Amino acid sequence: MNIVITGGAGFLGARLARTLLAQGPLALAGAAPQPISRITLVDRAQPPADLLADSRVATVVGDLNDLLRPGPSGTMAIAADTQLVFHLAAAVSGECEADFDLGMRSNLDATRALLEACRTLKTGPTFVFASSLAVFGKAPGQSLPEVIEDNTLPTPQSSYGIQKFIGEQLVADYARKGFVRGRNVRLMTVSVRPGKPNGAASSFLSGMIREPLAGQRAVCPVPADVAVALSSPGRTIDGLIRAAETTDADWGPLTAMNLPALRTSVREMAEALGRVAGSAAANLLDWTPDPAIIRVVSTWPGAIAATRARALGLLPDASFEAIIRDYIRENPDAIRLPVQP
């Protein structure tokens, strides 16, 4: 089986590639398991060294729109024998608010160009689109349902959320026409991400844990009572792979599926940090409001019902403390403070 991962050099893309390579044969859409022959990682940068060293990994470096542009230099990102595409490449929420044109190019134009490239293939590829809970938003003067269901009407309140919702509809229509097998998956906010902060409005939800564990100060830019819907990196990858594996009958409608989320609050996250790493870590948090971040994050839902995902065997993380401990176990070199057993 030949697989393409856009955004393959990023944190989630690289982790997805490692997981696929480690787990062996993949049962695509319920078919008989096939060994993975090649994973092509498409991104603006090279992936980590361990992936480059794997003979099953190919890389394509460049802007996705340029790589898919018709002509001699185009379509490098998707080979004729591609059977599965994970479309993770995106400009993130904060970037899209700061640069409207960047968001439209990265999240809308590139998604349609990739779907068009898949349309030309004779393989009828499975197309797993990484959407976002940002398709749901609280409009000024209005309220969201207390719990967001799979079929709750999206009301995005950011450019990023709108672009992701349009992407969902494009994937659904290309699937309806039989060009691809569509799998729209709404990712929750992923925490704790290792490495450096990115431009997402939700970046602090990793930074407020990651930086204190490294002995560094971190800013929490929203009130402590803000509710958030989170998923660990591992559970997020599980959801993407399960979407690729499930049969059309088990998947159900072409509309998007919410991944399971742990419902918590920023205060509870800080308290979990204190239980794991003590007051030395908790005291490194600076509660400094940022109106721009508050304006975006406060529109997002804090409680998600993932009925379809649960029917596929996917479950939320048990607790945020468990998420922190997973991060510590997976990133021992990034931890500078003593942690409680």
Language-model segment annotations:
Residues G239-V297, R336-P338:
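Mid/C-terminal beta-alpha module of Rossmann-like enzyme folds, strongest
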Residues S191-P194, C220-L230, A243, G252-T264:
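Glycine-rich Rossmann NAD(P)(H)-binding loop
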Residues R112-Q157:
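Conserved Rossmann-fold NAD(P)-dependent oxidoreductase catalytic core, especially the SDR/UDP-sugar
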Residues R105, P140-N184, S191:
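Catalytic helix-loop patch of NAD(P)-dependent Rossmann-fold dehydrogenases
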Residues M1-L26:
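N-terminal Rossmann NAD(P)H-binding glycine-rich loop of SDR-like oxidoreductase domains
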Residues V61-S106:
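NAD(P)H-binding glycine-rich loop region in Rossmannoid oxidoreductase-like domains
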Residues P289, P301-A311, L315-P341:
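Amphipathic terminal alpha-helices
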Residues A172-A227, P233-R235:
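NAD(P)-dependent short-chain dehydrogenase/reductase
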